[in-house]
């Protein structure tokens, strides 16, 4: 994918540019992202994780081919050029099968890689850092790298078989915290040391050589590291550049490599920009986008309660709460404390476990009901000012139509705008 190698080349030349990766499968989030990229005439990187999308369907029920079809159909409907769309696979490896013996988990990981590459995903994050059922804890760098090299070989062969040539770009390594936000309350976070980053790179370089893959090293464009950013349910650990100086300087010695930062959600615009300047030039964002979606929906539900008789309301928030209580598997092991603390977390936690529930048919019906109720007649401006003040300013200036859907999309785009600005470069 020329967009990514070109971005890395420009960054290495001192342009201080980057790219953000939208990590969400929600149609409204994806529509917001596609429309934003279209308006700003930039490429768009959309990523699926190994939890969301796999050869068996993942938690979204989509295979990689399904996900690609879904995104491309949406892009076509919005007249977004497919050659400006980059699809990535995140944390691809034995992640989903850690409860199985390593041989079985890695066989599944081989098939996972094949399914992503055959579907046309071009940015591949190889992550074999997790221990399987019969593995030591933690794994050595050498075992992690050997497994990643095995998957890279599968990826290269699959790409040549389906597309005639291998043009994949790879990301290696992993951040220390679990994907998708920390489970526990945070206070301090260890930044990856330069020595650890170098050890990961050298182990991978050696493992790739052993597999006869030395030639693809320039296509390994990024190493995932922990620059010292994370969030839990109610707190954000902000980027502190001074703590990451040595790590930032270390990557300057590698001609074709930058860093990828995960869990950048909820960082300030200033921190996002500084991350990119410091060579953490691929910024992953996911929960912050569905958090913004949830904020907009809760605001619209509050407006609905002001305008619509109680018996005709969608009851979106109550429906959501009921479904989350009936099916607690996506939040129960994450949210702790008494009943009130867990209730607040279900609705408002930064980790946004509510994102797993939007596809539910009852919740989707309530959402459609809410939009119908508010689309029948214009939403009074004072209520938009009360509940969506940033959108109110744009409505008043004529930039934004005050329809439920446009208000939601625009609220999500406020977050995307922060990432776009951080990645623009000079």
Curated annotation (Swiss-Prot):
UniProt similarity note:
Belongs to the GatZ/KbaZ family. KbaZ subfamily.
Among Pfam families, the record links this protein to: GatZ_KbaZ-like (PF08013)
Q: How does it assemble?
A: Forms a complex with KbaY.
**Name under which the protein is recorded:** D-tagatose-1,6-bisphosphate aldolase subunit KbaZ
Function as written in the Swiss-Prot or TrEMBL entry: Component of the tagatose-1,6-bisphosphate aldolase KbaYZ that is required for full activity and stability of the Y subunit. Could have a chaperone-like function for the proper and stable folding of KbaY. When expressed alone, KbaZ does not show any aldolase activity.
Q: Which GO terms describe its cellular component?
A: plasma membrane
- Where in the chain are disulfide-linked cysteines found? none
Pathway in which this enzyme or protein is active: Carbohydrate metabolism; D-tagatose 6-phosphate degradation; D-glyceraldehyde 3-phosphate and glycerone phosphate from D-tagatose 6-phosphate: step 2/2
Q: Which GO terms describe its biological process?
A: carbohydrate metabolic process; D-tagatose 6-phosphate catabolic process; phosphoenolpyruvate-dependent sugar phosphotransferase system
């Amino acid at each position: 994918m020329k967009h990514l190698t070109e971005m890395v080349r420009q960054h290495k030349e001192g342009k201080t540019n980057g790219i953000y990766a939208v990590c969400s499968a929600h149609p409204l989030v994806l529509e917001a992202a596609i429309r934003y990229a279209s308006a700003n005439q930039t490429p768009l990187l959309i990523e699926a994780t190994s939890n969301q999308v796999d050869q068996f369907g993942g938690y979204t029920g989509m295979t990689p081919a399904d996900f690609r079809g879904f995104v491309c159909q949406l892009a076509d409907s919005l007249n977004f050029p497919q050659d400006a769309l980059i699809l990535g696979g995140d944390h691809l490896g034995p992640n989903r099968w850690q409860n199985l013996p390593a041989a079985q988990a890695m066989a599944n990981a081989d098939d996972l890689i094949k399914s992503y590459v055959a579907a046309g995903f071009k940015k591949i994050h190889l992550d074999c850092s997790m221990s399987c059922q019969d593995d030591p804890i933690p794994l050595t760098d050498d075992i992690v790298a050997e497994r990643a090299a095995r998957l890279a070989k599968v990826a290269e062969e699959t790409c040549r078989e389906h597309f005639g040539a291998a043009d994949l770009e790879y990301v290696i390594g992993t951040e220390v915290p679990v994907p998708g936000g920390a489970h526990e309350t945070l206070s301090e976070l260890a930044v990856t040391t330069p020595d650890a980053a170098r050890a990961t790179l050298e182990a991978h370089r050696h493992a790739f050589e052993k597999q006869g893959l030395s030639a693809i090293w320039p296509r390994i464009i990024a190493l995932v590291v922990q620059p010292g950013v994370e969030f839990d349910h109610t707190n954000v650990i902000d980027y502190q550049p001074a703590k990451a100086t040595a790590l930032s300087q270390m990557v300057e010695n590698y001609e074709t490599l930058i860093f990828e930062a995960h869990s950048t959600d909820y960082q300030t615009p200033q921190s996002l920009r500084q991350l990119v300047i410091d060579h953490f030039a691929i910024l992953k964002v996911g929960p912050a986008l569905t958090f913004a979606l949830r904020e907009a929906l809760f605001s619209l539900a509050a407006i609905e309660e002001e305008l619509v008789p109680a018996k005709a309301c969608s009851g979106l928030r109550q429906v959501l709460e009921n479904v989350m209580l009936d099916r607690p598997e996506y939040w129960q092991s994450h949210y702790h404390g008494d009943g009130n603390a867990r209730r607040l977390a279900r609705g408002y936690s930064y980790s946004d476990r509510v994102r797993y529930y939007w596809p539910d048919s009852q919740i989707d019906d309530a959402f459609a009901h809410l939009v119908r109720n508010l689309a029948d007649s214009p939403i009074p401006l004072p209520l938009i000012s009360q509940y969506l003040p940033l959108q109110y300013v744009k409505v008043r200036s004529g930039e934004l139509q005050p329809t439920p859907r446009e208000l939601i999309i625009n609220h999500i785009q406020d977050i995307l705008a922060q990432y776009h600005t951080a990645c623009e470069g000079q």
